[in-house]
């Protein structure tokens, strides 16, 4: 493993998107949807070379004739056959590498069940014959990417959100909180409130359009009530969006009502705390001596933290909850959509990390449980 020519592969498997590339790069080479599609109907055209499954963008583009499955639900792998297909697609079609020639760094959700880490390890060594691998917790990588080893990460992606306090590079499992409210739920909510305006979006294809509207036009209001009043009294907050068929729709208070559910999950009919309160609760579960460091290093990560205005709103909400003298700093790096992957790229290319890899030899000697001893 000491020859420097071989780049490690970094694969961040999210509920919505898979990010993959080479350690040492500053951005992932491949970003594609974590979906596997299977044909709904038998092919009628002879010699069309019909495949029995499609992955990623190809599945997305043929979604009209396929049944789509997401093998990762709420950040945790639930379907291993499909997951294997996604990894196969990642190595052979997206990165075009032979996995038996590269060490592979995989990411996992906080509180990932032990059996799952073992299964990931087993598939990498037995199916793909990787020479070495490692499993790292997503939020910890985001913190590394921001240049810190202590802080609390609010990682919110497509399928799940977590608040993860980290001290000197170690996640504190007793204080990690999970919130099943993320990008997918916000897209669903936007579909619902646009329907109230008289626009109908129902199919999975139309859902992609709504996701695009969400990503381009939504923002977080600093003061929700005041923003609602502004929206009601003037058209200054209205924006138009052109649908693929040329029809133009107008969207007003939906722009900030949609992501407001991150702070008020009751909008979605959920009895949960908002992201600000979850972050605060997570900090309060930690030792009193380290709370100051967590308040001063609150790092946002993941695609669902990309809304304009979210950092200022978090600052305001957490300041209201915390002791009045506490210094609070919300860190929102511009590249936070990919900060898990970037942290993995940094980690896997550190010279000090090279002894941390689980080698094929160690795996052959100890079996899948080696992952609990080497990756924590």
Swiss-Prot record:
Task: Identify the tissues in which this protein is expressed.
Answer: All cells and tissues of the developing embryo. Later in development, expression is higher in midgut, brain, nerve cord, and gonads.
Under Gene Ontology molecular function, one entry of this record is: ATP binding
One Pfam annotation reads Actin
Q: What class of enzyme is it?
A: hydrolase
Question: Which locations, inside or outside the cell, does it occupy?
Answer: Cytoplasm, Cytoskeleton
Q: Which family does it belong to?
A: Belongs to the actin family.
Other noteworthy facts: In Drosophila there are 6 closely related actin genes.
Q: What is this protein's name?
A: Actin-42A
The species this protein was found in: Drosophila melanogaster
Native organism taxonomy: Eukaryota, Metazoa, Ecdysozoa, Arthropoda, Hexapoda
